[in-house]
Amino acid sequence: MISEAQKQQMAEAVAKIRETMAAAAKAAGRDPAEVRLCAACKTRTVEEVRYSADLPIDLFGENHVQELVEKTDANAYNGKPGHFIGHLQTNKVNKVVGRAALIQSVDSTRLLDKIDTAAARLGLVQDILVEINIGEEASKSGVDADSLFPLLEAAAAREHIRLRGLMAIPPADADDTETRRFFAQMRELLARADARHYDRAQMDILSMGMSHDYAAAIAEGATIVRVGTAIYGARDYSKKA
């Protein structure tokens, strides 16, 4: 059961995040409306998510397939889009395609093939982002920058996939200067990708920035920031959605 104190905390947190987002956008000479707030709701209950859906949150991001299934089935997002932002295994693609408005974490041609097949079966075109391992960390998913353009070309060749942009998570141990540099690299990669005019592509999404660095991401061109802890508080991994 979500308490009144939790509700107040969430409402105040989202209001503060919105203020910070608007200030960061204006400082960068951008329209605040260009940037959407994605609530990263991994481990959050259906009740928590349903309440937060009434706040000025634009969309929701799920890291786990089962949580996406449970929350979409329960209409926890209250009509707002749900995105898949975690590592997607090929054997779970069928549960995500058609449920997620956007799959943000595509990083292989094998995954592209599975998504394309599943989307064709449903008679739809699935929007995706390509995830870049911008810090070239062995422990993280995503393609390196050198492999990006061949993967974009492969995505553009799939009839039931539409490229929408790029996603990244900088290294957690990067300092503020390094993080800004990674975000700037992402902005430059998106511009280069957009200039190639891939078939069916609409390269207008740059998903980067989380609770601790979303203002810096906005300064460098993010159009989606993924914020979890700053909205819901510290995660309790013993809870199930």
Q: What does each model-identified segment do?
A:
Residues 222-240:
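Gly/Pro- and small hydrophobic-enriched strand-loop and loop-to-helix capping segments
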Residues 1-212, 220, 232:
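Conserved alpha/beta-domain cores
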